[in-house]
Design a protein with these regions (language model features):
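Short, Lys/Arg-enriched N-terminal segment that forms or immediately precedes the first helix
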Residues: 1-13
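Short helix-boundary/capping micro-motifs
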Residues: 28-39
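Residues within the DNA-recognition helix of helix-turn-helix
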Residues: 51
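Central "turn" residue of the DNA-binding helix-turn-helix
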Residues: 42-43
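Residue cluster at the C-terminal edge of the helix-turn-helix DNA-binding motif
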Residues: 57-62
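Key DNA-contact positions within bacterial/archaeal DNA-binding proteins
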Residues: 46-47
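Basic, amphipathic "hinge/linker" alpha-helix immediately C-terminal to the N-terminal HTH DNA-binding motif
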Residues: 66-89
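Alpha-helical linker/hinge and terminal dimerization helices associated
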Residues: 88-106
């Protein structure tokens, strides 16, 4: 057996941030575009942009900034606030996952080997 963690953050009962939304920001940062991030997630550009605007509205900060045109076309990058949100969420998630695994091991003990009983 192995524990799994599904994590999200709410503000006043409204979903603000989650693993899925963190992944979207990460893909945008890596590809340099909302379209590229959306494609990696299997989303339309419109849906990805809508998710970003929803997070920004709920948190009251800008997460991405876009530059239009130029020799290589436009580019989108995370704002310092977007980078900080992503870094803090990753850190929080890693700590929550480590705690969960520790608590799981304490509650269920080590996995059985070759049909041996599990020892707590």
């Amino acid at each position: 057996m192995e524990p799994k963690l599904k994590l999200w953050v709410e503000k006043d009962g409204v979903l603000v941030f989650s693993d899925y939304r963190a992944m979207l920001l990460d893909h945008i940062a890596k590809t340099g575009s909302i379209r590229g991030g959306a494609e990696r997630m299997g989303l339309s550009y419109r849906r990805a942009w809508g998710k970003i605007k929803e997070i920004e509205r709920n948190l009251g900060v800008r997460l991405v900034e876009s530059e239009v045109g130029g020799p290589g076309g436009g580019q989108t990058k995370l704002t310092p606030e977007g980078e900080q949100l992503l870094a803090r969420y990753r850190s929080f998630r890693a700590a929550a996952e480590a705690d969960m695994k520790r608590d799981f091991a304490e509650a269920f003990g080590k996995p059985a080997v070759h049909g041996e009983p599990v020892e707590p």
